[in-house]
Curated annotation (Swiss-Prot):
It comes from the Eukaryota. Mg(2+) 1 binds at D34, D91, E163, E165. This is Flap endonuclease 1. It comes from Phaeodactylum tricornutum (strain CCAP 1055/1). GO terms for biological process: base-excision repair; DNA replication, removal of RNA primer. GO terms for cellular component: mitochondrion; nucleolus; nucleoplasm. Phosphorylated. Phosphorylation upon DNA damage induces relocalization to the nuclear plasma. Its cofactor is Mg(2+). One of its GO terms (molecular function) is 5'-3' exonuclease activity. Interacts with PCNA. Three molecules of FEN1 bind to one PCNA trimer with each molecule binding to one PCNA monomer. PCNA stimulates the nuclease activity without altering cleavage specificity.
Length: 421
C-alpha cells in the first residue's frame, strides 16, 4: 500500500524533490527493484482479450499463468538495453504488526470476488475487468517463477528477511545501487536516497519515469527524518491505523507545530479527531483498572500478586512499533551483487518448453539480452546533461507557501511557550 497521500503532498509541498526524466537518463545506473510490486503490475497489465470480452491473464497449455513471466522477461531486457542494471528484491516474512493490513486486503478480495460474480451474471465486461484486477495477487508460485527466470537471465536476485522496500533502501544507502524502484512511497520512509517510480510502465511510447530525492523531501517539507517518519505514520501506512479525520495537509501542520506524534496526541481535539485505541493502549488499560476498582471496592492485582510479571508489550503504542520498523528494519548487510551472462539454453527451454512461449521470439529476445549484457559490462561514462528534465511548474509557488507555513508553525510554538511562562 505504501503511504496514503504522500505523493500528492510532496507534489504540493516539496515539488523540487520530484523529477520527470526519460528512462534512458538512468543509463549506467544500478537499481534495486521491488520484485513483488513488479510482478503484481505485470499480472494486471499483461492480458489478452478483445472487444466486449473480459481481459484475462496469459496462460500456457497447462493453464498456468504466464503474464508475470512475459512482463518480467520483456521489461528486464528493456532495462538492460537502456544500460540499466536491475537487481530484483523479493519480500521475506512480513512483520507481525502488518497482519491487520493483510486481513484488510483479504476482506477486500472477498468483496471483489462477490462483485465479480454479480458482474459476470449481468454480463458487465467493464466491471468484470475492474473486479478481476482487484483479485490479482502475486503468490509463491509467481515469485518462484520469476526468481528462476531472473537467475537464468543472469540478473541478481535478493530475498529480503522482511520487507523488500526496506532492503532495497538499505542497498541504496550502502551505495550498492543508485535507487530503489517501486511504486510504494514507504521506500522514502525507509530513507532510500533516490526513489524511481513508473519503471514498470516505461515502454517505447511512454519512456518517462519519476524520481524522488529523499534529501530534497526533508528539505522541502522543512522537517527532520524522525518527523518525516511520524508524518508518514499519521498519513497512513501498512503497520497501524491512523488518526481519523486528519488529512495530509493537517498531518504536516501538526508535525511542524508539535514535532512528534506523542505531542500531537496530547494537544489534539479528541472529540473532533478519533485517535486509535492502539495508539493509546495505556489509557484503555488504566480505564479498565479504574472500572475494576470501582466495582465493590475490588482492587486490581498488584505486580507482586502477578509474581512480578507485568505485560508491557501491549502497552507499546502501535505508532511506536511502526516507527521502530521504519528506523530499525531487519535487512541483509553483507550482499555482493553480480550480473552474469544468461544461461541461454536453459532460459530458452524454460520459456519455450515450460511456459509455452514462441521459440523465434524467445531466441530474438535472448540475443538482445546477450548484447545488452555485453554492452553493460564495458566501463561507461554517464552523460546526464544530455537528458532533459521536466520542471515542476508549482515549485516556486509551493516553496513560498512552505516557508510561510513553517514560519507560522514556529510562531505558534513560540506563542505557546510564552503563555506557559
Amino acid at each position: 500500500m505504501g503511504i496514503k497521500g504522500l505523493a500528492k503532498l510532496l507534489s504540493d509541498e516539496a515539488p523540487d524533490c520530484i523529477r520527470e526524466v526519460e528512462l534512458k537518463s538512468l543509463h549506467g545506473r544500478k537499481i534495486a527493484i521491488d520484485a513483488s510490486m513488479a510482478i503484481y503490475q505485470f499480472l494486471i497489465a499483461v492480458r489478452s482479450g478483445g472487444p466486449n470480452q473480459q481481459a484475462t491473464m496469459l496462460t500456457n497449455a497447462e493453464g498456468e499463468t504466464t503474464s508475470h513471466i512475459q512482463g518480467m522477461f520483456n521489461r528486464t531486457i528493456r532495462y538492460m538495453t537502456e544500460g540499466i542494471r536491475p537487481v530484483f528484491v523479493f519480500d521475506g516474512k512480513p512483520p507481525d504488526v502488518k497482519s491487520h493490513e493483510l486481513i484488510k486486503r483479504r476482506e477486500k478480495r472477498e468483496k471483489a470476488q462477490a462483485a465479480l460474480a454479480v458482474a459476470s451474471e449481468e454480463g458487465n465486461v467493464e466491471e468484470q475487468d475492474k473486479q478481476s484486477k482487484r483479485l490479482v495477487r502475486a503468490g509463491t508460485k509467481e515469485n518462484e517463477d520469476c526468481r528462476k527466470l531472473l537467475t537464468l537471465m543472469g540478473v541478481p536476485v535478493v530475498t529480503a528477511p522482511c520487507e523488500a522496500e526496506a532492503q532495497a533502501a538499505a542497498l541504496c544507502k550502502a551505495g550498492l545501487v543508485y535507487a530503489t524502484g517501486t511504486e510504494d512511497m514507504d521506500a522514502l520512509t525507509f530513507a532510500t536516497p533516490i526513489l524511481v517510480r513508473k519503471l514498470t510502465f516505461a515502454n517505447a511510447s511512454k519512456s518517462m519515469v519519476q524520481t524522488m530525492n529523499y534529501n530534497k523531501v526533508i528539505e522541502g517539507l522543512a522537517i527532520s527524518h524522525d518527523q518525516f517518519v511520524d508524518l508518514c505514520i499519521m498519513l497512513g501506512c501498512d503497520y497501524c491505523d491512523t488518526i481519523r479525520g486528519v488529512g495530509p495537509k493537517t498531518a504536516l501542520k501538526l508535525i511542524r507545530e508539535h514535532g512528534n506524534i506523542e505531542k500531537v496526541i496530547e494537544t489534539i481535539d479528541r472529540k473532533k479527531f478519533v485517535v486509535p485505541e492502539s495508539w493509546v493502549p495505556n489509557e484503555k488499560k488504566l480505564d479498565a483498572q479504574s472500572d475494576d476498582d470501582d466495582e465493590e471496592g475490588v482492587e486490581s492485582p498488584s505486580k507482586e500478586e502477578n509474581n512480578g510479571i507485568v505485560d508491557t508489550e501491549e502497552l507499546i503504542p502501535a505508532y511506536v512499533q511502526a516507527r521502530k520498523l521504519f528506523n530499525e528494519h531487519e535487512v541483509l548487510n553483507d550482499i555482493e551483487l553480480k550480473w552474469k551472462p544468461c544461461q541461454a539454453e536453459d532460459l530458452q527451454k524454460f520459456l519455450v518448453d515450460d511456459m509455452g512461449f514462441n521459440v523465434d521470439r524467445v531466441k530474438n529476445n535472448i540475443e538482445k539480452l546477450q548484447a545488452a549484457y555485453k554492452a553493460n559490462s564495458k566501463p561507461q561514462t554517464r552523460m546526464d546533461s544530455f537528458f532533459a528534465v521536466k520542471a515542476n511548474p508549482n515549485a516556486a509557488k509551493s516553496a513560498a507557501k512552505r516557508k510561510a507555513d513553517a514560519a507560522k508553525a514556529k510562531a505558534a510554538v513560540s506563542k505557546k511557550k510564552t503563555k506557559k511562562h
